[in-house]
Amino acid sequence: NHMESHKLTSKAEKAIECDECGKHFSHAGALFTHKMVHKEKGANKMHKCKFCEYETAEQGLLNRHLLAVHSKNFPHICVECGKGFRHPSELKKHMRIHTGEKPYQCQYCEYRSADSSNLKTHVKTKHSKEMPFKCDICLLTFSDTKEV
């Protein structure tokens, strides 16, 4: 697996360890920047999920997490497979699996997608020289998340 070998190679190059969380870094500057995360966490009141380990400094993000992960309210039901969704827009997007509809067309080639985010990823990875995906360990950049 390319990703696993990449991670192992990158971890071998890391010699400095954060004494608060155990994360490893290749140079002191990266460790210093990382330690700011721990300082910011201590300065802010953390909102913790009562069902799992999730925590955040923002109440709104906790509310979104609770709805997305722990809510059992799925009022919009797919008539084809019975899967439930919280919002009508999620059901509409899901229905494209059953209908085969792909309304999003690439402006550079024949690629079509049922989802706008998949089209954006396609354009970035196939039609640009951008390298938007960065490895957290070695900081190299890649055009596709599968390469990280």
UniProtKB/Swiss-Prot annotation:
It is found in: Nucleus. It holds the Pfam family zf-C2H2. It comes from Sus scrofa. Keywords: Activator, DNA-binding, Metal-binding, Nucleus, Repeat, Transcription, Transcription regulation, Zinc, Zinc-finger. The binding of ZFY to DNA is mediated by the interaction of the GGCC core base pairs with zinc fingers 12 and 13. This is Zinc finger Y-chromosomal protein. InterPro entries: Snail/Krueppel_Znf, Znf_C2H2_sf, Znf_C2H2_type. GO terms for cellular component: nucleus. Belongs to the krueppel C2H2-type zinc-finger protein family. ZFX/ZFY subfamily. A zinc finger (C2H2-type) spans 16-38, 76-98. The keyword Zinc applies. Its main location: nucleus. Probable transcriptional activator. Binds to the consensus sequence 5'-AGGCCY-3'. The gene is ZFY. It comes from the Eukaryota.
